[in-house]
Amino acid sequence: MRRAGYECEYLEAPHLLPLTSEVDIDGEVVQITNGKRENARAWFLYSNIDNADASMALKETPMEYIGLEASISRLKTYLEQNSDGFYAVLGFSQGATFGHILSQLVCAEKRVLGANTFCKIKCAVLLSGFPSMHNILLPDRATSGSVATNDSCSDMNDKLDLRSLHIYGDKDTSVPKSFAEKLSNLFVNPETYDHGKSHMIPHNKALIERVVTFLDSCYSLE
């Protein structure tokens, strides 16, 4: 990306995931391993009991994303502390879902006179994502990140008028292609790219060129 002239900033998600969890199996508490990756982090959590429990991630029912406000605050602070310019958000898996939430905030902020923080984001590249099931209050109604009722967020059902590129693989079993397609359908004129692989970001020339072409087209409109 840097060779194409784009500077990448890797922001760290605020929630540290535990390496082990305790679960109840037939009345007996058993310790399980959540993987070997140390410093694994999340933009939000699904359970107050077990921070590593992601069993609700693909449930297509409204829910509260625990700790989301901390992530929104982190992005807001970053944007406020940096100069105006061309910003794009890129996220993978849960990061792509967080990108969906940020896209909602971008479009909501456009309707608020004088609001110009999230509006710095001009486009989104969302890889292997799924639609957010967390309802947020619009900036002109309350602090972003607060939980709201469906009635107060009715206009959030409108398609998001933000340039977007949705990347996924038809062999993905962690976040099936259908979820990424549902996410893309929440945007106006989404662009899509199927890399044909599983739940991963392929490091190949074709994918990089597709992303750079998309970013170049968005930048040319500024």
Predicted regions located by residue number:
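Acidic catalytic loop of the alpha/beta-hydrolase fold
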Residues: 132-134, 170-175, 198-200
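Short glycine-enriched nucleophile-adjacent loop
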Residues: 96-112, 124
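Serine-hydrolase catalytic machinery in alpha/beta-hydrolase-like enzymes
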Residues: 1-88
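A conserved short beta-strand
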Residues: 111-131
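C-terminal catalytic histidine-bearing segment of alpha/beta-hydrolase fold enzymes
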Residues: 189-222
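Short beta-strand/loop motif that positions the catalytic acidic residue
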Residues: 159-160, 165-168, 172
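Short alpha-helix in the alpha/beta-hydrolase fold that links the catalytic acid
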Residues: 138-140, 176-185
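Gly/Ala-rich beta-loop-alpha elbow adjacent to hydrolase catalytic centers
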Residues: 87-95, 99
